[in-house]
Swiss-Prot record:
Residues 1-10 are cytoplasmic. Disulfide bonds join C160-C171, C189-C253, C357-C366. This is Beta-1,3-N-acetylglucosaminyltransferase radical fringe. One of its GO terms (cellular component) is Golgi membrane. Has some activity with cobalt but not with magnesium, calcium and zinc. Residues 30-48 have a biased composition (Pro residues). Belongs to the glycosyltransferase 31 family.
Amino acid sequence: MNSSCLGLRRTCFLLSVTAAAVLLLLLPRGQPPAAPRRRPPPAGPSRPSPKREARPAGSDVPGDRGGGSGAAGGGRGVAGSPWPSRRVRMGPPGGSAKESLELKDIFIAVKTTRKYHKTRLELLFQTWISRARGQTFIFTDWEDRELRLKAGDHMINTNCSAVHTRQALCCKMSVEYDKFLESGQKWFCHVDDDNYVNPRTLLRLLSAFSPSQDVYVGRPSLDHPIEAADHVQSDGSKTSVKFWFATGGAGFCISRGLALKMSPWASLGNFISTAERVRLPDDCTIGYIIEGLLEVKLLHSPLFHSHLENLQRLQGESVLQQVTLSYGDPENKHNVVSVGGVFGLQQDPTRFKSVHCLLYPDTIWCPNKKMS
């Protein structure tokens, strides 16, 4: 009895082991193999976003190809085009496109002196200032009641000397710069009281840039950069710096972004001390700060004009495409633009009235017919 039970147990044990072995052999064949776990691909090296260069196409402002007072060989623009070859509208990275520029965004500073209030300034108020009164500020050296009534708070008495010296010129430029920063406007443009400003072409030119860019545009009066002593070394020797500058007699413009960077050398009277250190007049000191210290290049433009150049070569319709014009001094009174005007030379010796009537024929004092 015991032996038969023992044999039965052994048989059951062997059958159990055999069944388990069979199940183990059959189980892998009955199921598909598990899919291997996929790993995410390794991240490649991060690529920086492209740098947004604050640079208009081809330096954007046409190079000066003219003679005489132009920056021969120094122009950085596109030959044969009176305007930038493409309009760059750059905003901050990831931001919206740059807003369109309006005339109200431009701060136009006119530098003058007491003796020209009745002559030069009167002509400007009669012509182009009448089309940009809200944007134009008169910087003078004397409290003129009549001018105050005409210009209101847009007449700024700088309390600078009326003498035509380096110190007096830099004093006025210092006040111009500070007033521009206070204004909050996007562009600073300086002109003299013998300049005609075409607001339309000025707006068109500056619209090619963003005011947050570093932009310094104007016309040199020399065909080469100038050199100024920069620092005095411990051994008494001086280091010098070469730079271009835009002549104030033709006018120039500076973006707000660049003007803010000039602040350590230009704001709150620092402009005067900077000018004294390098012993340069106002427009040269502007160029020294921008090109010499901040290393921002002047954009040479042939659209700005001073009395130092041969203005008679500007003729016909091309006169109306310029940003600024000027006229010769009394010793060179025939140095004026050649425009088929509505006034004769005796009535309009500067040609500003004729230019203005061609641009704005609806002006009330413009005659209906051109003079032959």
